[in-house]
Design a protein with these regions (language model features):
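Short, glycine/acidic-rich hinge or "gate" loops at secondary-structure transitions
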Residues: 147-151, 251-263
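Class II aminoacyl-tRNA synthetase-like tRNA-binding/catalytic domains
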Residues: 2-236, 244-246, 329, 434, ...
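A translation/RNA-centric and nucleic-acid-associated enzymatic feature enriched
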Residues: 149-240, 269-462
Length: 462
């Protein structure tokens, strides 16, 4: 496929990044011939040489049969930079003296191509900068970065999460000896085992998987940042989250076209206050299914379909999640940056209850512009109570006809050994990148995120 249209230049090949970087060295001035490379693209009636982040207009100063530019071709070009009078130090275009075709495209432009990559280049660079900032944030606070397995024996019992199954088959043993596991939905169980082993301040940024979730805010695989403080309360973690939010977002977040100021201290509300304002009743007087169903029915808060579905399952949390979609999320969308604290106990399987009010769990979530970003607990350390809650989850899963995952016995053993009083939080990195860039879909900040056909609903790989 390679064809040279001129003798190979003895000039050193200079990347577009180096050629166009601010403050280029004298040997990259417009008076000297240059050799660079990239992909050809047609833009606004002109040819350009591009990579994911940069585009340089080309001026073909010669005519030669067979040298016609080809959209998408990978090429090397030799010639001179041309600068404008108004910006003598900023290259305006490149006068091409010779061109070498390295590869001609053999198919139509793929989904992940130079054209799409050019739109994602800023987001990819933003992720790299954010990763550096996150690491510096925790280094400055004497946290230890840890790595735990992505493939685990038991990912959890949560009724509302569906783990991705994964198995190991030794080719030299029979199928009955296969080891069955799951891709973790969170590193929480493994990290708490490290807390029980004596580690006190730990953090991790990792990929996690949750089956079935493909929306503008969800992808089956996403990046989760999780950290824990042993011997410290929930206020310390909440302060961490607020400080890190400003490190990652600065003084402003963007939800699509909407700008949200982060200059003022983040608002704090209890879930009781949120529901009182959004729905007009006291959720702590309705922590049993029949009581909440009666309120939703009498006040006509939910549709008959939603009420009937909840009646069939006899699940308090189903009623709550319907209220969340119809009332709570829209209400929080009007509040800028807000920590929602003190959740009803049925919504916090892994959190401690408040000693003064067992109806309330020591849980918080951070919302900015109505987007849920972080979820934290004062961690439950009682192994018997934790097992009871897991068993209740499994009972609910069975009633709903859902698969029954294994009990997380190794995590429960760590609780039996002794988990120190601890607080922790999980934060969605991709969503923070969306709020930094104003992206409206997770695919804009995660180039390989899965897609769902809007007509058929079918999911597909990128």
């Amino acid at each position: 496929m390679r064809r040279k249209t001129s003798r190979q230049s003895p000039l050193k090949l200079i990347s577009l990044n180096e050629l166009l970087r601010p403050g280029a060295s004298p040997d990259q001035s417009s008076s000297l011939p240059q050799r660079t490379a990239g992909r050809l693209a047609r833009r606004a009636e002109a040819w350009h040489l591009e990579n994911a982040a940069l585009s340089l207009k080309l001026n073909f100063a010669y005519q030669r049969a067979g040298d016609a530019p080809i959209p998408g071709a990978l090429v090397e070009v030799c010639g001179h930079l041309i600068t404008s009078k108004d910006a003598p130090l900023k290259p305006h275009e490149f006068s091409v003296n010779s061109i070498e075709f390295l590869h001609r495209p053999q198919l139509a432009e793929p989904a992940l191509s130079a054209r799409r990559a050019s739109r994602l280049a800023e987001a990819v660079a933003l992720r790299a900068r954010s990763n550096r900032d996150i690491r510096a944030f925790f280094d400055a606070r004497d946290f230890l970065e840890v790595e735990t397995p992505n493939w685990v024996e038991a990912a959890g019992t949560d009724v509302h999460l569906s783990p991705v199954s994964a198995s190991f088959q030794d080719p030299h043993r029979s199928a009955k000896d296969a080891i069955h596991g799951q891709l973790h939905t969170s590193p929480e169980f493994s990290m708490k085992r490290l807390l029980a082993a004596g580690m006190e301040r730990i953090w991790q940024m990792t990929k996690v998987w949750r089956n079935g979730e493909i929306t503008p805010l969800h992808n089956p695989e996403f990046t989760l940042l999780e950290w824990y403080r042993a011997w410290e309360g929930l206020d310390a973690i909440i302060n961490d989250v607020e400080h890190l939010s400003r490190v990652l977002l600065g003084n402003q977040a963007r939800v699509g076209e909407r700008a949200i100021s982060l200059e003022a201290p983040f608002l704090r509300m209890t879930m009781q206050q949120v529901i009182e304002e959004a729905c007009g009743f006291d959720i702590l007087e309705a922590t049993e299914f029949d009581a909440l169903l009666a309120i939703c029915t009498e006040r006509k808060l939910l549709s008959e379909n939603s009420l009937n579905r909840a009646r069939k399952l006899h699940r308090w949390d189903e009623l709550f999640f319907e209220l969340e979609i119809d009332y709570i999320d829209p209400f929080l969308g009007t509040k800028g940056a807000v920590f929602v604290c003190d959740w009803p106990t049925p919504l916090a399987v892994l959190a401690r209850t408040k000693p003064e009010d067992p109806r309330v769990a020591q849980r918080f979530e951070l919302y900015i512009g109505g987007v849920e970003l972080a979820n934290g607990f004062q961690e439950l350390t009682d192994p018997a109570e934790q097992r009871r809650r897991f068993e209740a989850d499994l009972t609910a899963r069975k009633a709903a006809g859902l698969p029954l995952p294994p009990m997380p016995e190794r995590f429960l053993e760590a609780l039996q050994w002794g988990l120190p009083p601890s607080s922790g939080v999980a934060l969605g990195v991709d969503r923070f990148l969306m709020l930094k860039s104003g992206a409206e879909h997770i695919r804009e900040v995660a180039p390989f995120a899965m897609a769902r056909d809007p007509k058929t609903g079918k999911a597909s790989w990128s």
